[in-house]
Amino acid sequence: MLPTVRKAFRERGKLRKTIAGHCVQEQLEGVAIVQDQGKPLGASMGQCTTLGRFTERSFTYVPAATLSLKQIQLLLGITAIWGMNWPVMKYAVTQYPPLHFRTLCMLFGMVAMWFVARQMKVSLKVPREMWGRLALLCIPNMIGWHLFCILAVKELSSGRAAILGYTMPVWAVLSGLAFAHPVSRRGWIGLTLAMVAAMLLLSSEFAAIAGSPLGVILMLIAAACWGFGTTLIRHYPTGLHALTFTHAMMPPTIVAMGLAGFWFEGTDVGAPQGWSQWWPIFYNAFGVFAFCQVAWFSLAKSLPPVVSSLSIMIIPVVGVMSGSLFLGEVPHWPDFVALVLILGAMAVILVPGRRSK
């Protein structure tokens, strides 16, 4: 069993420190890495297991990560609220300028987070030494994603935007190259499927009389920002509570989105008028930012990538179905084919394959 343990740690973990070949500290990815009498062994994402000598007596077995009831509830909530938010955003940007809409969503969302933090007795104070790291994480995870996403939603149907947005896991795999993580064969297969889907939708937009190829490109850029940002979160942990972590990135994002709104949409945009313009803002402020954004970062830091990312596979399906139900959007055959390809890409990348015994 001992060589299997060493091999598993080399393949599935990130070697932190080795002293004379005896003392090893590993940060595991949180999947089942060893089989011992049919029982999977592993460790949760971000948990460090310090081993003594590589002997069966001193080896510490840590149970593989499992989902608690609370985590299951968070995943279901994220799936429903984020999935239905695609038609909500599409409706909102037809009623109000998109960049101003997103800025107001985040502004009210930050206030909602403050109240949630008070109720949970979570400190929102960020140590000074973390400011630079948070600024780095904020650029792709918040500014890049929200800026390009909301501009793309204005150009595309909500279902098509959702399909393209959830190419994120593919971009997360590619972004691993920046950290010298080679792309596996499954990663390249997933990338190929996602690119075929993107090209199919792009060609469909070119062929349509009122199509918007720019919308496809903007949504792919947004997804790439999200994927790269998710990778950065795992490589540059802050140790902050998920609520503190998310809240701290809101002010610079609000400033960036506000400036972009003034630049592209002008300064004479009035306040939202009527319930038709206000309710999407409240939905995003409380549902997306105060709940989904915090829950996502919490799961991204506490669960393995495989577990936390599997939850997003159903979101584009919810987006397509809810867009058809609430907005009367009619998906065409390129949308269905692209959806299948994207789901296939996510499955190839996120679902662990069988390993030889």
Residue ranges and their predicted role:
Residues R6-K7, R12, I19-V24, D36-T103, ...:
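Glycine-/small-residue-enriched transmembrane alpha-helix faces in small-molecule transporters
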Residues L67-Q71, Q95-T103, V126-G132, W188, ...:
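Juxtamembrane helix-entry segments on the extracytoplasmic side of multipass membrane proteins
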Residues T79-G83, L137-H146, M168-P169, L202, ...:
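Transmembrane alpha-helical core positions of polytopic small-molecule transporters
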Residues I81, N85-W86, W114-G165, A198-L200, ...:
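Specific transmembrane alpha-helical segments of multi-pass solute transporters/efflux pumps
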Residues G83, L107-V111, M195, I254-V255, ...:
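Small-residue-rich packing faces within the transmembrane alpha-helices of Major Facilitator Superfamily
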Residues R102-L104, M142, H146, R160-T167, ...:
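Helix-helix packing/entry segments at the starts of transmembrane helices
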Residues M113, T167, V183-E205, M313, ...:
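Hydrophobic transmembrane alpha-helices of multi-pass small-molecule transport proteins
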Residues E129-L136, V183-M195, V216, L240-M249:
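Cytoplasmic-side transmembrane-helix entry/capping segments in multi-pass membrane proteins
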